[in-house]
C-alpha cells in the first residue's frame, strides 16, 4: 500500500543570515525598576470599518486559493527618532521605549522595513502584562534585506523596549512600516469565526493517536504569517544532499508582499487531543528567499533566512517523484488558522488537471 503525505497548503485540493530566533534574557526595565520613567509614550492606531472587512471575509473565506486573513494592516512610519522616549541610563547606555495600542485587537504583530542593530544592543517586544515576551532580538537577527516580521502577541497593546550599550559601532536602524491589528484570533479563542478550535471535524489534533505514526512529518509543518495579516501553511523539506538547507515548500497562491518579512511558526500544536489547547508561540523564524514558483501547479519553494535551531526539534520531510498514484493520502496543515491538524483520505488518488497542471486529487 502506498501512502502519500500532503502538507495541505494546497487548499484548492484539501480544504484549505539569521531570523526571528530570540536570544533570551529579560527586558532591562525589569531590573531598573523605579529608576526609569514609568510613563511610556503611547501611539494609538486609528479605527477602521470592521463591517467592511467582515463582508470581504465572508466572500474570501469561500475561496480555496487565497490566504486566510486575520488582521488589518495599519501602514505607519514609526521609528526611534519620531516616536517613543529615550532615557540616559548613564555610563554611555541608553534605553528607548514605545507603547503601541490598537483598541479591540485580539493580537498585534509588526513589520519592520528597517531592522539593523549594532552588536550588544537588544530589542524586546511584549504585551502590557508581559505574559508574552519576544526577545531578545539582537544583531544576530540582522539580514541583508534589513527587514523583519514579528510573531503575534496577545492583546491590544504592546511595548517596544530597545537597549543600547556604550560605544556601539553605529546607531540602530529601526523603522516600523506595519502594525497589524488582529481581529480574528489565531491563538486561543474558539468564539472567533475562524481560527483556534474552528477547523472541520475531519481534522484531528496531531497529538491524537491518529497522528502518532506521522510524528516526524508533523514536526516539519509550520503556519506562516503572510504580508503581516494573512496565514498559510507549508513544510520544511529535505534535499538529495541531506545537508539541512532550510528549504520550505508552500503554495504559490500564498505569495504576496515580500517573503523576507514572512514569519514561520513551528510546533504550534495542541498539547491535548481533546479539547484543543493553545500551543507555544515562540518557535519562529522570520524571513525567507523565494527560489521558484508556479501558478499552474500552485507551488512555491523558499529558503528560510536561517535554519531552525536544534531546540526547535524540526524535521526535514522527504519527497518523491515516482509519479505513482497513492492509494491513500494524509494531510498535515493549519486549516483556517487553527493549531496543527492531521486528516486522512482513504480513497485512491486520481489524476486531475488544475490550472493546466497535472495533479492528484
Ranges and model annotations:
Residues 1-25:
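Bacterial Sec-dependent N-terminal signal peptides
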Residues 107, 120-122, 261, 328:
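Exposed beta-strand and adjacent loop surfaces of beta-rich binding modules
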Residues 105, 130, 227-229:
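Glycine-centered tight beta-turn/hairpin loop motif at sheet-sheet or coil-to-beta transitions
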Residues 153-361:
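Serine endopeptidase catalytic core focused on the charge-relay Asp
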Amino acid at each position: 500500500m502506498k501512502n502519500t503525505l500532503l502538507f495541505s497548503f494546497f487548499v484548492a485540493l484539501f480544504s484549505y543570515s539569521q531570523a526571528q530566533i530570540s536570544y533570551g534574557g529579560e527586558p532591562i526595565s525589569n531590573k531598573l525598576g523605579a529608576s526609569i520613567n514609568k510613563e511610556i509614550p503611547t501611539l494609538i492606531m486609528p479605527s477602521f470599518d470592521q463591517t467592511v472587512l467582515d463582508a470581504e471575509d465572508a466572500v474570501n473565506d469561500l475561496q480555496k486559493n487565497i490566504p486566510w486573513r486575520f488582521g488589518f494592516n495599519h501602514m505607519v512610519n514609526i521609528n526611534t527618532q519620531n516616536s517613543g522616549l529615550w532615557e540616559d541610563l548613564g555610563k554611555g547606555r541608553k534605553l528607548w521605549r514605545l507603547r503601541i495600542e490598537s483598541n479591540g485587537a485580539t493580537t498585534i504583530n509588526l513589520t519592520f522595513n528597517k531592522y539593523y542593530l549594532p552588536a550588544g544592543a537588544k530589542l524586546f517586544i511584549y504585551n502590557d502584562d508581559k505574559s508574552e515576551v519576544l526577545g531578545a532580538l539582537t544583531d544576530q537577527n540582522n539580514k541583508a534585506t534589513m527587514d523583519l516580521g514579528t510573531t503575534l502577541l496577545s492583546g491590544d497593546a504592546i511595548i517596544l523596549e530597545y537597549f543600547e550599550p556604550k560605544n556601539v559601532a553605529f546607531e540602530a536602524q529601526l523603522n516600523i512600516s506595519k502594525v497589524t491589528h488582529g481581529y480574528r484570533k489565531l491563538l486561543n479563542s474558539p468564539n472567533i469565526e475562524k481560527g483556534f478550535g474552528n477547523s472541520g471535524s475531519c481534522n484531528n489534533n496531531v497529538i491524537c493517536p491518529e497522528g502518532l505514526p506521522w510524528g516526524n512529518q508533523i514536526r516539519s509543518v509550520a503556519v506562516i504569517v503572510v504580508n503581516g495579516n494573512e496565514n498559510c501553511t507549508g513544510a520544511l523539506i529535505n534535499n538529495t544532499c541531506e545537508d539541512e538547507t532550510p528549504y520550505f515548500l508552500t503554495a504559490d497562491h500564498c505569495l504576496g508582499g515580500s517573503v523576507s518579512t514572512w514569519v514561520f511558526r513551528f510546533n504550534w500544536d495542541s498539547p491535548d487531543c481533546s479539547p484543543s489547547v493553545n500551543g507555544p508561540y515562540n518557535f519562529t523564524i522570520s524571513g525567507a528567499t523565494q527560489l521558484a514558483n508556479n501558478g499552474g501547479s500552485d507551488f512555491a519553494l523558499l529558503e528560510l533566512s536561517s535554519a531552525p535551531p536544534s531546540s526547535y526539534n524540526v524535521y526535514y520531510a522527504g519527497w518523491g517523484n515516482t509519479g505513482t498514484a497513492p492509494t491513500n493520502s494524509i494531510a498535515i496543515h493549519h486549516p483556517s488558522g487553527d493549531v496543527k491538524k492531521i486528516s486522512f483520505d482513504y480513497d485512491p488518488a486520481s489524476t486531475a488537471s488544475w490550472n493546466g497542471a497535472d495533479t492528484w486529487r
